[in-house]
Amino acid sequence: MTVSTTAVVVCGFDALLPERGVAALIGDRQIALFRTYDGQVFALSNTDPVSGANVMSRGIVGNRGDVPTVASPMFKQVYDLRTGVCLDDPSLVLTVYPVRVTDGQVIVGD
């Protein structure tokens, strides 16, 4: 599920390390930002749907075939970074936020 939010500059693109996640607070929402080796940036809910803990930014970034993924650090379910859908159990879904990079700045929201 993609959620619309007011556009907010979160950080500089260079502050995101490839294949690592970082947490950010936008209003009262915790989000997890991920930058992949090919330079794509993804924004998802930081809340693990299984445990309820705000830990997704500490997940293991990788891929399954051509699908960029993050594995929950709690129970290791693997989520598609593009859609938020769990590849192991499609009933589990992370909220996806619109994200873009403009002038070297990572902007979350519309």
Q: Model regions: which residues?
A:
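Rieske [2Fe-2S] iron-sulfur-binding domain
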Residues: G21-D110
